[in-house]
Curated annotation (Swiss-Prot):
Residues 118-306 form the FAD-binding PCMH-type domain. The modification Pros-8alpha-FAD histidine is found at residue 156. The keyword Signal applies. Its EC number is 1.1.99.-. FAD-linked oxidoreductase; part of the gene cluster that mediates the biosynthesis of the aspoquinolone mycotoxins. Within the pathway, asqF performs FAD-dependent dehydrogenation of the dimethylallyl quinolone peniprequinolone to yield the conjugated aryl diene yaequinolone E. The first step of the pathway is catalyzed by the nonribosomal peptide synthetase asqK that condenses anthranilic acid and O-methyl-L-tyrosine to produce 4'-methoxycyclopeptin. 4'-methoxycyclopeptin is then converted to 4'-methoxydehydrocyclopeptin by the ketoglutarate-dependent dioxygenase asqJ. This is FAD-linked oxidoreductase asqF. Its cofactor is FAD. It comes from the Eukaryota. PANTHER family: BINDING OXIDOREDUCTASE, PUTATIVE (AFU_ORTHOLOGUE AFUA_1G17690)-RELATED, FAD-BINDING PCMH-TYPE DOMAIN-CONTAINING PROTEIN. The keyword Cell membrane does not apply. It is an enzyme of class 1 (oxidoreductase).
Amino acid sequence: MALFRLSAAIVVIFLYIWSPSQRIQCRCRSFERCWPSQQDWSALNNSISGHLVNPRPVAYVCHDPDFDHDACEHVRYMANNSLWRASMPGALQNTVWESSLVSTQTCLPFSAREQPCNQGRIPLYAAVVESKKEVQTAVRFARKYNLRLVIRNTGHDGAGSSSGPESFQIFTHRLNSILYHSNFCPGGSHSKYQTCAGPAVSIGAGVMFRDLYARGAERGFVVTGGDSGTVGAAGGFIQGGGVPAFMGYTWGLAVDNVLEFEVVVATGQLVIANADENADLFWALRGGGGGSFGIVVRVTMRTYPDLPTLKGELTVSGNRHDPSFWTEDIAGLLNALRAFNHLDAPGVFRLIQTSAKGSISAVLEVYLLNRTLAEDLTRMMGPILGTSRRKYNISPITVGKISSFANPNEPTITEFFGSTILSRNFFESPNGPLVMAKRMAAINLDPGDGLLTSNLGGRINNENSDLPLHPAWRSSAHLVSLVVNVDTSLRARERAMVRLTDELMPMLYAIDSSQWVSYSNMGNPNEPDFKERYWGMRNYRRLVSIKKKWDPKDLFIARVGVRSDGWDSEGMCRT
């Protein structure tokens, strides 16, 4: 009898240890007993006005047993439409993150019909929320059942944080309110602080820059936003720091211009965060990374006049194996960029390798704000380019408003990213542009790979606001981003990730060897030293402290985000 009782006790202990509902080290998964029942999911659906869906990869209609010819043709036609993808819970803008990271599970629109369609990293359920209350309800549900929670607006994401296997998605795309304030007072007009900040705009979590710029154009305002029209204005872009392509030089980073957040935190509570109220959370959200501290349902930013703007383009083509192409043509464009900056004209440099034989195409875009005469920019170009202007194709000057230069609907991508920040001391050194060009030449690009810059410096260097971003941002000149084209197969993705981390990133950081600093929104998704690269250890420790306060159980975890090192790469199990 004693032996029986001992054996029974061992069985009970074994079942306790291995019972999925007791494995607090992992999120609950669909094959475990802790997973919500159909009745639980139905109750959630009823509580959020019927807005719960079961996302499937958008290409499932192109594969057996669900093949539908007409539906598949529509998916194939829309596959590269960024606006369409933004509206689909089962799609991402960067399709590399739709497929499994550890298996061949894919579901691609142009693969063979008989090839199985697998869920991959597309969430199993999505709450397509239409109100703040629905966000709160969905967060509480995820917390109650210990679900892997992912947050998605438009699906622009360089590290895969908007999707995840066995996950529950909160899809914020329909929270698209835009409210202009002639004089915004954080905390409301009856706030005890009574510190009003002038013109501003409050935007819902689902607002895209294309819509915000369009509304601003009607009223004559613009914000320091991105140049990609389908990027969400209130999500990961701004919470990661918010680097505009060229407006930052004049008005600072997007986070320099945030006045207030409205956030659903891990308890499901809706809180206001600004410089006076929940100031620690306000600090963390202005650069601490998206998907780490809560779900921002509304953000309020300063606005600026939608000024008339001139845009000029200089292009050049050559071969990467020709040293003079780098030391003369590319260095010449970078020298011109520096000279334009000295005249308060920001610019963007882009370079792409177009063939396996090493063909390179490069362009410098220059912006001159608050000017309406094309001749103003033409006269500026003359002394800057001098006799070297013969090397470049100079496009006609474009005259427009700032808001008109955003890309309204860029194509879908399959890419990995990396980035580095160049210091002002490096770029302004006598041979800075030449050294930059030579070190770019050393980066072994493949066809479809590219390099691009975003203009920092200017107002970004002059801001005194305290941010979580690495301190090097305040003495920066340019952000250089690396774009690596990736094939869809698992083996190709694995090779591309290794190549990016082990080969390309060290060469990218070596452009300015005085500092190794990166931008999380365009960072290596496998960055081994992300804490130091993105924030610096002092800021990172402060971010960790704030996260422990607001999200002690890590309901919100983003790949290479705050406290993500305590979890596996999918945020599913603690390590």
